[in-house]
Amino acid sequence: MDIESSPALRLTGLYKRFGGPWVVDGVDLVVPPGSFFGLVGPNGAGKTTTLSMAVGLLRPDAGQSHIFGFDVWSDPVHAKTIVGVLPDGLALPERLTGRELLTYTGLLRGMAPATVAERTEELLAVLELTEAENTLVVDYSAGMRKKIGLATALLHAPKLLVLDEPLEAVDPVSARTIRTILQRFVAAGGSVVLSSHVMALVENLCDRLAVINRGQVVAAGTVAEIRGEGALEEAFVRLVGGRIGGDEGLAWLAS
């Protein structure tokens, strides 16, 4: 298989529900290789569920996910070897230190111990976690947990990164560092799929994006195509049928 000519991620007819209405309702999506792809949508739109199915963390009721041509469910070993994942609400081994977590992750992936040690050192330094490398993960702040989670996703040098809200709870300095890392990753030929609620972030980082609403893709294309003549936030509100509130009621707040 020529993975270089395959889409970085292809989702075909993904469906998922949890006993009620469809949370993901027939999602089809193609992420070209080498792209910085944004996934946006209102709260509860199905973004996290879609990404969880895309990388094999959640089994779909129907549909397929391929990472560089490898089926996530029928060929998980090859698919998961070339993807790095930062899920929302990542559960980490709480009783390991940051350094131990990276070492454990690398060895579990079958990486050479010397390579694991070298990359662990670099990642801890670049993400400013060196001072906390011997601190238990249970004692990490929300932002530190996000950074160590990103480090585990980067450790094995994947071809595709799938990141669910990677900058949430991260301080501005660390956020800029992470943005630089991701931009360098794409410039070197990697592919990124990133979900976020921050339109300015998506607009500045991504070259392509998809808008999900009520479990369906309502728009997909380049940022310029979806944005049109106005701001991306205006296009987003129009596409999801949102209503900007806050100008009525709550009179008691000023009393």
Residue ranges: model-predicted function:
Residues 202-204:
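A short, surface-exposed alpha-helical micro-motif characterized by mixed small hydrophobic
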Residues 220-221:
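ABC ATPase "signature
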Residues 103, 107, 114-132:
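Conserved ABC ATPase "signature" region
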Residues 161-165:
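Catalytic Walker B motif of ABC-type/P-loop ATPase nucleotide-binding domains
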Residues 157:
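Conserved catalytic motifs of ABC-family nucleotide-binding domains
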